[in-house]
Amino acid sequence: MSSKTDTLELSVTATTATDALYWLEHIALRDRWSARLRFTLTLCADEALNNIVSHAFTPGHPAAIHLTLRQTRREVSLHIADNGAAYDPTQALSPPLARSLDDAQPGGHGLRLMRHFMHALSYQRRDGWNHLTLTSHSAPES
């Protein structure tokens, strides 16, 4: 495989994350990704998209999310762009791990998950848009 690109543009609704994950799952099946790549990229995309949908937009703001998936022999990158409030997740600190489930507090653990499973996370703010890229070096199976 030389290079392959897929794109999806969404208005933000109650089903935005679900619609995006369906699109990603379709590509994973079409291109015969490994089970690990499919699981990790879908899990991390779900986390990022749900955070964007839940926290990035104010009521009445025309909200949009654009996804671009680029695949090469060596890596798969999911670029997520949104026109919501500026937020750089690569600069956020993950909360300390709790000693037990009873002590666990919600918040920030999805970022830990993305840092664990992705080989690279990058962020830029350009022209009023957040640009987050999740990259995995796990190549699709052929």
UniProtKB/Swiss-Prot annotation:
InterPro entries assigned to the protein according to its UniProt record, in alphabetical order: HATPase_C_sf (IPR036890)
The keyword Glycosyltransferase belongs to this UniProt entry's keyword annotation: no
Record field: catalytic activity: L-seryl-[protein] + ATP = O-phospho-L-seryl-[protein] + ADP + H(+); L-threonyl-[protein] + ATP = O-phospho-L-threonyl-[protein] + ADP + H(+)
Enzyme class (EC, first level): transferase
Domain of life where this protein originates: Bacteria
EC number: 2.7.11.1
UniProt keyword annotations, A-Z: ATP-binding, Kinase, Nucleotide-binding, Serine/threonine-protein kinase, Transferase
GO MF entry, a single one: protein serine/threonine kinase activity
Classification via Gene3D superfamilies: Histidine kinase-like ATPase, C-terminal domain (3.30.565.10)
One Pfam family in the UniProt entry: HATPase_c_2
Transport in keyword set: no
Family according to the record: Belongs to the anti-sigma-factor family.
Known partners and oligomeric status: Probably able to multimerize; interacts with BtrV.
Function of the protein: Possible negative regulator of sigma-B activity. Phosphorylates and inactivates its specific antagonist protein, BtrV. Upon phosphorylation of BtrV, BtrW is released and binds to an unknown partner(s) that might be sigma-B, thereby blocking its ability to form a complex with its partner (possibly an RNA polymerase holoenzyme (E-sigma-B)). Involved in type III secretion system (T3SS). Phosphorylates BtrV.
Further information: Type III secreted proteins Bsp22 and BopD accumulate intracellularly instead of being secreted in cells expressing the mutagenized BtrV.
Protein's name according to its UniProt entry: Serine/threonine-protein kinase BtrW
